[in-house]
Amino acid sequence: MKPSTLLSLLVAGTTTAWKLDIHASDGRKVSTHGTRDSGCKNIEFTPVLNVNRANFKPATDLYPDPKTFELYVNKGCSGLSYRNGKGDWRLTPARKIRSYKVY
């Protein structure tokens, strides 16, 4: 095995990513993850998710940890509905969410 391949495997095995789990009141869940800012991401569920909980774990290796996640009413990240940081959050009342950002 080439040293560069071995190094890649070692780094891949130890790299962690931020994680955002979005829970809907009907039991559906969206799990997302990454190592850098997400940019705007649409959530493609029909019917739309009625979100009542979000769990954000921002820890990453090798990259600065993101501080914030945002949930939006509309696709394309318009109509900000909720913003928070690290933790497990209850959204009361539940709200319809169609997109998100992590940064």
Predicted features by range, described:
Residues M1-L9:
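Classical eukaryotic N-terminal signal peptides for Sec-dependent ER targeting/secretion
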Residues T5, T14-Y103:
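Compact beta-sheet-dominated domain cores in extracellular/mature segments
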